[in-house]
Amino acid sequence: MAKVTVMGSTGTIGKNVTFKLAKEDVVSEVVLFSRPESIDNAKGQSYDMYDALAAEDIDCLLTPSCNFEDLAGSAIVLITAGVHRKEGMNRRDLAFVNAKIVANYAKQIALHAPDAIILVATNPVDVMTTIALDASGFDRNKVIGVGNHLDSLRLKTYFARRLNINSSEIHTRVIGEHGDNMVPLLSSTTIGGIPLKYFIREVEIDVLEIVKTLRNAGNTIISKKGATEYGPAYAISNLITTLITNTHKILTVSLYLDGEIADVKGVCLGVPSVLSKNGNAMIIPIHMNEYETNKFRKAAEEIRTLTEDVRESLKEDD
């Protein structure tokens, strides 16, 4: 049984992750961490969740807090805090604003929960993962971004629905940036163990259109209902329970690269990794075709440039 802290627990994703985690058998306590001005909201969330948990005879401690000392003993600290992109705000603007929040929280985690694994969900997640790594001083395998895990689940869903096949038969993955430069690994996608390219020959399927839909998935949901909730929350909960239970699943998360894939170094990107409870995330080297390799390297350069600019901005603010 593990203690998990959710920083940004009153946000749309934060509160959904908190409730999902509270229902997991492997979680004994969830700290609903918030800013002081939002602590009443966090308390209200906990009261509401307790009522729901009682209906299912679930016993999980929910601790609303704005005190960093309550991070102590956390096995995992999830950072979801930050601003959301507003009209007229681009990814670069978002990165500069959220970097200050993430850096501050990462420093506090290092001080109060030095043995925890940091899981970053704040966007742009690949840049924010590097910022959290810098600020915490942790080993690179103990600072993990949610990366392309949700993107991979979305791609799996699209193929399953289009081909009318159970999603458990779809094995596919998205790597690279969680954003415009994501790289769907179509060359290694299989359906029931059969390469995707053989299905394409038999079924009319526009792969480029599916990829476009995948990249716009989040915006499509936001335009229709205002926010993405369940997909991100369940994807994040899946990552956390995988870390806690030590099941060694291979999931696509954002990690700091040192040449393991396509010779890319010094940047955080979504890559397939074996996750364990001690934070020993092991990156799996993979084979890609030329197109995928070039797209992955392009993603690396764009994220690297933005990351360095954000790093310089943080230095100027110190």
Regions found by a protein language model. Give the residues of each.
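Conserved N-terminal Rossmann-fold NAD(P) cofactor-binding segment
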Residues: 33-74, 305-315
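N-terminal Rossmann-fold NAD(P) dinucleotide-binding loop
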Residues: 14-15
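Extreme N-terminal starter segment of soluble prokaryotic enzymes
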Residues: 1-4
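Hydrophobic Val/Ile/Leu positions in short beta-strands of Rossmann-like dinucleotide-binding domains
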Residues: 6-7, 32
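C-terminal substrate-binding/catalytic lobe of Rossmann-fold NAD(P)-dependent dehydrogenases
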Residues: 136-142, 151-318
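Rossmann-like NAD(P)(H) cofactor-binding subdomain of soluble oxidoreductases
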Residues: 90-156
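Conserved glycine-rich cofactor-binding loop
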Residues: 10
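Rossmann-like NAD(P)-binding element
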Residues: 54-115
